[in-house]
């Protein structure tokens, strides 16, 4: 027989994971401004500014959606738990979207995706190869990594929320 705490944890994890996963594309693609999408990977302060602004809007959207879903389901998610899960997504989102650290990680011996990054590119304008936009390996791995991290963020949020009730 499953304990009531386990049932609550599984239900909360499912709700959080569905929310984090399904809200992600909206916040990452639609809420993000075109300017930030184009410039967030630029080197230096300019890129950092655009990436930070994108992560701020992404994080706000995710937090509002998470609060709305859990409240609609009659669950009061502890602020500490919501903040922790949201912070995991925000910090990692910034690192991934700055591009160069993520590309170094993907090209590392540990991951070994340099060939895939070089192979799956697109040409949007004659003579200009894009390695990071829609239709590229980098974009696919960016989205896959964000979603994987969303699982960890959901788990952390659930753990902290359930623990605060015990």
Report each predicted region and the residues it spans.
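Short amphipathic, positively biased membrane-proximal segments
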Residues: 1-166
